[in-house]
From Swiss-Prot:
Membrane in keyword set: no
Keyword terms, alphabetized: DNA-binding, Metal-binding, Nucleus, Receptor, Transcription, Transcription regulation, Zinc, Zinc-finger
Main location per the UniProt record: nucleus
Keyword Membrane: no
GO molecular function, one term: zinc ion binding
Name of the molecule in the record: Nuclear hormone receptor family member nhr-133
InterPro entries: C.elegans_Orphan_NR (IPR051152), NHR-like_dom_sf (IPR035500), Nucl_hrmn_rcpt_lig-bd (IPR000536), Znf_hrmn_rcpt (IPR001628), Znf_NHR/GATA (IPR013088)
This protein's encoding gene: nhr-133
Zn finger intervals (NR C4-type): 11-31, 47-66
Residue spans binding DNA: 8-83
All residue ranges annotated as the NR LBD domain in the record: 150-406
Gene3D superfamilies from the UniProt entry: Erythroid Transcription Factor GATA-1, subunit A, Retinoid X Receptor
Length: 406
């Protein structure tokens, strides 16, 4: 690299200290700026004549006409003007390509979201394979009919929330003797097992809520079909938090079914039974955003260590809000009534049993966990919609409303 060029001396136009070479001449900034303005095409001083004929040569206060003439005499050249140097104004000025199209990304170019960029349209399947889940719905009906005949004595429990909690504790106590297994592969059998255990587990939970048992049978099924997945999400996160608190599971291991856990980063996924695409092509669709939705909620559950009464209240809030938002009408009316009753029960539990007068801060943190789970389910709903539009899977269910989360 050549050494830096240092220029010094008087301005060749006004003889004031120069600041550098401007338009081919050693000049000050003032004369350079003057020439830049005056020498433009159609400038008002370009063709005028000095009134005096010519200003005194050594007069520092030349008229503008003579000053421009002096600039030209010493060698200033308008061909050395540089235009479009202003980055801000240049960026705001529309160009030919921005007028016709938006900036192209790979997702825009292919017309597919980023997490399915590798999908090939020729692998989309218009022929669907039906998975019949009618037997699960029939089993849920049977659970609701069986528990509807069960008599509840208010003398045994302070309120319906604590009744629900007590009965669910008894069920989990019976199942606690089962050996915990680690899932290394998730394929057709594992996916259907998760569906069966989660759907029927939610049905058993709902059946033990007295206010729910009084609802119309069709409303019960509608609520269950809408909320079983969101129920399973919180139920399994709460179970995972219990194991993490006891140091029985690693930080990256989560509960999958009632007695099965998995590490999402190590588990092998088999989707040959449901899609023509490979796991690598659909990994962004299949693997949940654990850092965004699961890990923070799990950390809060471990720290807060909610009681079983609090946990069941969180489940009620999640499930009934989800069902009410989707169905509106009679379903919304029924869910709002139950939510109001359970809110009163929760207030009574905090103030009378736990002796907490100011519990709003703790309850707000519990509801924050619920909002994170709701966001996760909304994200899954959007992905399911995209999967349907692009025919990513060739499997359909006999009751598709079970997989249309609110």
């Amino acid at each position: 690299m050549p050494p830096a060029l240092y220029l010094s001396g008087p301005c060749e136009i006004c003889e004031q200290p120069a600041h550098g070479n401007h338009f081919g001449v050693l000049s000050c900034r003032a004369c350079a700026a003057f020439f830049r303005r005056a020498a433009l095409q159609n400038a008002k001083y370009q063709d005028r004549v000095c009134r005096k004929g010519n200003c005194i040569g050594n007069d520092l206060y030349r008229c503008k006409i003579c000053r421009l003439k002096k600039c030209c005499e010493v060698g200033m050249n308008s061909s050395k003007f540089q235009n479009d140097r202003d980055l801000i104004s240049s960026s705001l000025r529309p160009t030919n390509y921005t007028k016709t199209s938006a900036p192209q990304s790979l997702a825009n170019f292919l017309g597919r979201p980023e997490f399915i960029l590798c999908c090939e349209p020729d692998k989309a399947s218009s022929t669907k394979r039906l998975v019949d889940v009618t037997s699960l719905v029939d089993k849920a009906w049977a659970i609701f009919q069986e528990d509807a005949a069960y008599s509840w004595s208010p003398n045994h429990y302070p309120n319906s929330l604590e009744k629900l909690t007590f009965e669910m504790e008894e069920i989990k106590l019976k199942e606690s003797s089962k050996k915990l297994e680690i899932a290394t592969t998730i394929g057709r059998n594992e996916a259907l097992l998760f569906l069966e255990q989660s759907f029927l587990g939610a049905a058993q939970w709902f059946a033990r809520l007295p206010e729910f048992s009084m609802l119309d049978p069709q409303i019960k099924i509608d609520i269950l079909k809408t909320s079983w997945m969101i129920w399973a999400r919180l139920d399994k996160l709460a179970a995972t938090a219990d194991f993490h608190r006891q140091k029985l599971l690693g930080n990256d291991v989560y509960m999958w079914t009632d007695n099965t856990c998995m590490n999402p980063g190590n588990v092998k996924i088999d989707i040959k039974w449901s899609s023509n695409y490979s796991v690598e092509q659909l990994r962004g669709f299949l693997v949940p955003d654990i850092e965004k939705y699961w890990r923070h909620a799990l950390s809060d559950l471990v720290e807060l260590d909610p009681t079983n009464v609090e946990l069941n209240f969180m489940l009620i809030q999640l499930c009934l809000n989800s069902a009410g938002q989707k169905y509106q009408g009679h379903v919304l009316e029924a869910t709002e009534k139950i939510l109001q009753i359970q809110s009163d029960n929760m207030h009574e539990y905090y103030t009378k049993k736990l002796k907490l007068v100011n519990y709003s801060g703790r309850l707000a943190r519990l509801m924050k966990i619920n909002r994170a789970i709701e966001a996760d389910v909304r994200d899954r709903k959007e992905k399911n919609h995209i999967a349907k539009v692009f025919d990513l899977f060739f499997v359909e269910y006999s009751h598709p409303e079970m997989f249309e989360f609110s």
